[in-house]
Amino acid sequence: VYSDIYVGEGVYKAMSTAEAPSILAAVTETPWEYGVLKIRDGGFAGIVEKPEKGKEPSNLIFAGMIKITSDHKDYFKDLPLSPRGEYEATDALTSMAKDYPVSIVRVPESDIWLDIGRPWDLFTASRYRLEELLQEKEVVKGDVSPYAHIEGPVVIEEGARIKPYTYIEGPAYIGPGVEVGPHAYVRPWSIMMSNSKAGHSTEIKASILFEGAKAPHFNYIGDSIVGEHVNLGAGTITANLRFDKGTIKMTVKGKRVDTGRKKLGAVIGGYAQTGINVSIYPGVKIGSYAWIYPGCVVKRDVEKGGVFRCQEAST
């Protein structure tokens, strides 16, 4: 299973019952952005990587799941590096199709398949998962102060602590060991993973905080992704809206990409740290282990392990 896809439970069931070798296929409105299946006599005959728009060999793309047995593992040995410097499982599948009939399993119409290869795709996937989770259970197991207010569907896991004068608006997920408050505000579609923290006078809006991420005081985290064990200094703010209300762009592999979103904050990699009173522009990415000095306005991406000093803010 590729790590950059999100699929529903029905997809796993369909693949588990399929005969090996088999691959998952999906229909998308932009097939030229993916590996497109070549079909021969109704079966799989190979994959064309990112064909020219309008010249796709079919309307099915390789959807990131493969089922094989030990009989097929040799096809994945000694693969050459592709032009983009990766070992492509699709090359092995194309070779395999010359010797075996490879079954095509389509994503069931009643189920979901999402490409989550871009940072903002996680927001769509997390909403689907949160909706699924709230259908399974809507529970409050953690320690909730009688002076806190909870409205709407939420999951608050065992070991979480909701302190006085905190307001949580569902749908929301509060994981085990999470600490919220006092005087904090968690808005709809927020997900706080285990041992993360939203402290005094902090607001979390439609954001994802990964394990151990800390927004301990006077922070605004809007439409943002905060990686594991990030620590945000007091007063760190993520801007999530342009003055002109236009869609926000993000740099992906060196190119500016229109996300199509009018609300999008920052993407902060694991173990990064910000000093006090840091302001981060919409669509900015901060790499893992980066340091942002106090008082800085961050207008550009910061590389993994980078150090951003305030005199760089105007460059």
Regions found by a protein language model. Name each.
Residues 88, 94-185:
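Extended, small-residue-rich solenoid/repeat segments and analogous flexible loops
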Residues 1-41, 77:
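Conserved beta-loop-beta/alpha segment of the NTase-like Rossmann-fold superfamily
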Residues 16, 44-131:
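Catalytic-core segments of class I nucleotidyltransferases/pyrophosphorylases
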Residues 198-315:
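Glycine-rich hexapeptide-repeat left-handed beta-helix
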Residues 1, 6-8, 68, 232, ...:
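Hydrophobic/aromatic residue at the end of a short beta strand that borders the catalytic acidic motif
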